[in-house]
Regions:
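Gly/Ser/Thr-rich active-site loops/lids in small-molecule metabolic enzymes
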Residues: 88-106, 169-191, 225-231, 258-261, ...
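Glycine-rich phosphate-binding loop
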Residues: 131-234, 238
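Short, glycine-/small-residue-rich phosphate/pyrophosphate-handling segment
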Residues: 1-35, 41-56, 196-228
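Glycine-rich phosphate/pyrophosphate-binding loop and the adjoining helix
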Residues: 33-69, 87-88, 235-283
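Generic hydrophobic/aromatic pocket-lining and core-packing "Φ" positions
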Residues: 18, 84, 96, 100, ...
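Glycine-rich phosphate/diphosphate-binding loop of Rossmann-like nucleotide-binding domains
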Residues: 14-15, 19-20, 64-132
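Short beta-strand segments
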Residues: 1-2, 71-75, 113, 152-154, ...
Length: 283
């Protein structure tokens, strides 16, 4: 884990020595860039200890997703109405975070783009925190270039207010106290943009429905050009957003498979196994 002045790091002798070490099988962690003790800025800072640990662990990682980069969206998004109120949903982020943990355990490098949750971060995941759908869309676009597998678990708000009031909207502002009209505009479709990007990562969606579960999931699979979709009934309190259990039906373009009720962590492991199998078969 080299650490030195940026001029020393850039010296040809240093670079030649590093090349010699690499050719002998020595792995270098870093250096990173930033402000140095001498006051200069550039490459030469030792990586943070957590980053060294993560990179070192990756060297010894094996598993069904070893060598892959998985990007997962998780949790809800919030669309502000005024400084006090917002539009959101009941998503807890539990299934998305469980999938991140399962992917890490399968050997993948994992990035999570997460809406607001109260969950502990999965160890060794790179986390990007957002609030609104536009923020999540932008974060995904920035991260997608080297992603092998994208799993869109987040319960994204489809619409947002056209304008956000700078002050709290008072009840007295409603004409004759008969309520107010909230004008909405459609948000960008995150998973469709990923599924139609070039190069396209293996793209997995979620369909959280309350009726016609399989029919609506199949429509989404086709319309958004997905490789897989996981359908679940969020109207069932036993397996809904805040439950620790889940029951799903997984759909591919040519088949379906029902997964019985189990913990969300066990469900995540099973989904990761099926994703890995499908990716391998596609290759």
């Amino acid at each position: 884990a080299p650490a030195m002045n940026q001029a020393m790091w850039g010296n040809p002798s240093t670079q030649q020595n590093c090349t010699t070490l690499a050719n002998r099988g020595v792995h270098l962690f870093g250096p990173g860039a930033g402000l140095q003790a001498c006051g200069e800025t550039g490459l030469g800072r030792m990586l943070d200890v957590d980053e060294i640990v993560t990179q070192a662990a990756d060297l010894f990682t094996s598993g069904i997703l070893a060598g892959t980069h998985v990007l997962i969206t998780a949790g809800p998004t919030r669309e502000a109405i005024d400084p006090v109120r917002f539009i959101t949903n009941h998503s807890s982020g539990k299934q998305g975070y469980a999938l991140a943990t399962a992917a890490i355990e399968a050997g993948a490098r994992v990035t999570i783009v997460s809406g607001p949750t109260h969950l502990a971060l999965p160890d060794r995941a790179n986390c990007v925190f957002v609030t609104s759908t536009n923020e999540m869309y932008n974060a995904v676009q920035q991260a997608i270039q080297d992603v092998d597998i994208f799993i869109g678990v987040a319960a994204v708000a489809d619409y947002r207010p056209v304008t956000i009031s700078e002050q709290k909207i008072k009840k007295s502002a409603a004409p004759s106290n008969n309520g107010i009209t909230l004008e909405l505009v459609e948000n960008p479709d995150i998973i469709a943009s990923v599924a139609n990007s070039e190069p396209k990562p293996f793209t997995v969606g979620f369909a959280a429905e309350t009726e016609n579960i399989i029919e609506y999931a199949r429509q989404k699979l086709v319309a958004k050009n997905l490789d897989m979709i996981i359908a679940n009934d969020v109207g069932d309190d036993d397996i809904g957003f805040n439950s620790d259990q889940n029951r799903t039906t997984i759909l591919w373009p040519d088949r379906t498979q029902e997964i019985p009720i189990m913990s969300k962590s066990a469900m995540a492991s099973r989904i990761i196994e099926l994703i890995a199998e499908t990716v391998e078969n596609n290759d």
